[in-house]
């Protein structure tokens, strides 16, 4: 079962980790009785993009060739280093005398009709599926639940996938009336294959002209010259490129594999003392490979696959033979130790009063170790070997310099946290309940300044059962409950310190001295980010809860919000960011949920539920001069009195009646009004708010059909109110392949 806890009362128990809410996952347990077998299956279908989609308005090959011809007829001067394909490529070849006029005409006709479907070639409709098989049973002394699962998720980009095997064992044991134990063990093995970050298939499919062939008429891959980087002996710094060749000769593989126990003691009636411990260990291996036939390796080789690299400094060769293999191996170990006491007391003539006290301490630890390495000269298709013992190493001085450097890096991280928490609760019959929750956290990752001020997390909450008190005799109302809560949460960033943090480096062979660099600036004045939250709600149930509704409202105020500010280069590190308490953020919202069971028979049941919510926020902050114009255009600037994520655009004045081009208000005739204005004041005067990136309203519809032991679920989620900028009509022609 998955529960989402958002109010202050629920999140107070989870401390600083719960600043944005809590997701609680409860695994299944065994029940007394003979063995019961279960099977659960879920599926997901994802549709790939298509050129016929409304939001994909791209030229076909004939339109793109015509567009290139119009540019040429207008004597548009193409950049000399532009990738020449399509009409521009055919025309350039003709002008250079590399083809006749008839060949030029035939090439243009071919480009007009090729109409490459890049979305079909590079992406796919996907079907993902999840299977879980379980068995449970037991007697009064021992109960068990064992499950095994398999999950396969294919990515929209072809050749990408995630595959996972899982196993779970839950044992509940009763040794006596006062000694009980729960043991749980789980594990998973997963394998992933993603495209290299340099190969963005979706972006390539959207931004590449359909007049660019993917295959030659004989079915072989079509290559075109694409720009590279660095010094090169190739004309205009270009090497052959085919995205299918890059995908076929590269891989980004991830292999990972990832136990818990709890002892519960009940010494006296009404008092539970539980001690639990949990240990997890995960081991991951990531391998990134670039083959020697790829454009990526050609840039480092400074030559094509079949070419011998030019020797000497002029050759600028960083990889004479083979490909590149990058490996990262990491091990993460974590543990949790918890001691908890639960006490319940019933008193009164009819035991109508109930008092409950729960308290405990929790200790968490996490250790991570990793090693990364890069090796060149790797040949995957010849027995996973490396090319070594190069006799002519001096012919490639750049590669020799690279070999003399250390390309192995190690990482080691340790974190410890100790927490204490309590819950104090009182209830009278089933009429009303009052709760007081609290928690504190201390960690080696909070920074020493934050621990100087003790800021616990606490909340108070209550609920009143109106149905029992006021509408007890109204039969069609089965539940009517009013609830409310108020709480305070604190948050501190892990990597901030009042002291300057220096990263110690290795020996510099030039100066024969150990070197160091600035890792974090001192931040002695950073304060806790504090959130006060007030929640209220009303729950109504009709006809024995066949129909139920819930109304919720909340008001959340976060003070001393963390914000990143650019630090001037005079501080020693250009472009570095500094964390400050940048102001306050007010969030107000509501939610409405409805659930119903329209059909319920002995074997069949249909449940329907819907949820709708709205959120309205406003920033209260002073102007920060370190924002740039792009921050206002992208919506990353915080502006006083404006919702977070709001972005601005130049004021549109309409179309120019003489030539049809768009007109914008540039304040050219009122420049004097902008004198001595800050950037924020200038933006607010000359631009207009276009919207905000985050949705204002969101909701979902859910249907669940159950027939005997089979169930089928369908969910639809939506969001309203967010805005994004439109895609550009076309990419800059300078790229050549757009």
Where do the protein language model's features map onto the residues?
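Charged, glycine/proline-rich intrinsically disordered loops and linkers
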Residues: 67-106, 299-314, 383-405
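Low-complexity intrinsically disordered tracts that form flexible linkers/tails across taxa
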Residues: 192-208, 619-627
């Amino acid at each position: 079962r998955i529960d989402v806890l958002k109010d202050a009362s629920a999140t107070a128990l989870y401390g600083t980790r719960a600043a944005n809410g809590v997701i609680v996952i409860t695994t299944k347990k065994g029940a007394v009785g003979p063995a019961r077998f279960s099977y659960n299956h879920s599926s997901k279908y994802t549709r790939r993009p298509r050129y016929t989609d409304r939001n994909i308005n791209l030229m076909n090959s004939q339109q793109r060739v015509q567009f290139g011809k119009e540019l040429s007829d207008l004597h548009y001067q193409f950049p000399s280093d532009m990738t020449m394909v399509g009409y521009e490529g055919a025309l350039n070849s003709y002008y250079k005398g590399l083809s006749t006029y008839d060949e030029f005409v035939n090439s243009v006709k071919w480009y007009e009709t090729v109409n490459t479907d890049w979305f079909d070639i590079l992406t796919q409709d996907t079907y993902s599926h999840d299977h879980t098989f379980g068995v449970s049973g037991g007697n009064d002394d021992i109960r068990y639940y064992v499950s095994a699962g398999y999950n396969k998720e294919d990515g929209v980009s072809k050749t990408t996938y995630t595959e996972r095997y899982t196993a779970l064992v839950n044992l509940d044991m009763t040794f006596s009336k006062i000694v009980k134990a729960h043991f749980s063990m789980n594990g998973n093995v997963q394998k992933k294959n993603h495209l290299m970050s340099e190969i963005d298939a979706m972006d390539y499919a959207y931004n590449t002209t359909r007049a660019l062939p993917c295959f030659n008429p004989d079915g072989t891959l079509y290559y075109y010259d694409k720009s590279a980087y660095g010094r090169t002996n190739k004309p205009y710094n270009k090497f052959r490129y085919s995205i299918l060749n890059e995908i076929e000769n590269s891989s980004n593989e991830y292999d990972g594999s990832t136990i818990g126990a709890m002892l519960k003691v009940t010494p006296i009636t009404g008092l539970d003392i539980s001690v639990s411990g949990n240990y997890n260990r995960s081991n991951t291996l990531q391998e990134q490979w670039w083959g020697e036939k790829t454009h990526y390796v050609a840039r480092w080789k400074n030559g094509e696959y079949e070419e011998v690299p030019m020797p000497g400094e002029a050759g600028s060769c960083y990889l004479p033979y083979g490909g590149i293999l990058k490996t990262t191996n990491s091990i993460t170990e974590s543990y949790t130790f918890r001691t908890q006491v639960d006490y319940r007391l019933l008193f009164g003539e009819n035991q109508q009063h109930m008092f409950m006290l729960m308290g405990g301490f929790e200790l968490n630890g996490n250790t991570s170790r990793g090693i990364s390495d890069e090796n060149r000269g790797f040949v995957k298709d010849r027995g996973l070997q490396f090319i070594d013992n190069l006799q002519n190493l001096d012919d490639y001085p750049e590669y020799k310099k690279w070999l003399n450097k250390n390309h192995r890096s190690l990482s080691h991280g340790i974190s410890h946290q100790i927490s204490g928490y309590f819950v104090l609760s009182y209830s009278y019959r089933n009429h009303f309940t009052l709760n007081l929750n609290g928690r504190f956290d201390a960690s080696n990752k909070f920074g020493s300044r934050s621990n100087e001020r003790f800021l616990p997390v606490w909340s108070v909450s209550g609920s009143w059962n109106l149905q029992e008190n006021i509408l007890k005799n109204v039969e069609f109302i089965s539940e009517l409950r009013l609830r409310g809560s108020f709480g305070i949460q604190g948050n501190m960033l892990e990597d901030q310190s009042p002291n300057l943090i220096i990263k110690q480096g290795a020996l510099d062979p030039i100066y024969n001295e150990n070197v160091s660099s600035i890792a974090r600036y001192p931040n002695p004045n950073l304060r806790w980010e504090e959130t006060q939250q007030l929640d209220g709600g009303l729950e109504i149930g009709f006809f024995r809860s066949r129909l139920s509704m819930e109304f919720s409202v909340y008001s959340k105020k976060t003070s001393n919000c963390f914000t990143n500010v650019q630090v001037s280069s005079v501080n020693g590190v250009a472009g570095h960011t500094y964390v400050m308490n940048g102001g306050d953020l007010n969030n107000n919202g509501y939610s409405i949920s409805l659930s119903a069971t329209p059909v319920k028979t002995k074997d069949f049941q249909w449940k329907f539920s819907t949820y709708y919510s709205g959120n309205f926020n406003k920033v209260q902050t002073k102007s920060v001069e370190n924002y740039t114009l792009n921050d206002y255009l992208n919506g990353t600037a915080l502006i006083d009195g404006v919702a977070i994520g709001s972005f601005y655009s130049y004021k549109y004045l309409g179309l120019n009646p003489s030539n049809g081009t768009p007109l914008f208000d540039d304040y050219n005739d009122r420049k004097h009004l902008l004198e001595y204005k800050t950037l924020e004041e200038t933006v607010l005067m000359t631009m207009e708010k276009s919207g905000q990136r985050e949705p204002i309203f969101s909701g979902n519809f859910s249907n669940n059909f159950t027939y005997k032991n089979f169930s089928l679920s369908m969910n639809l989620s939506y969001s309203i109110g967010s805005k994004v900028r439109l895609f550009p009509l076309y990419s800059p022609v300078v790229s050549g392949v757009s």
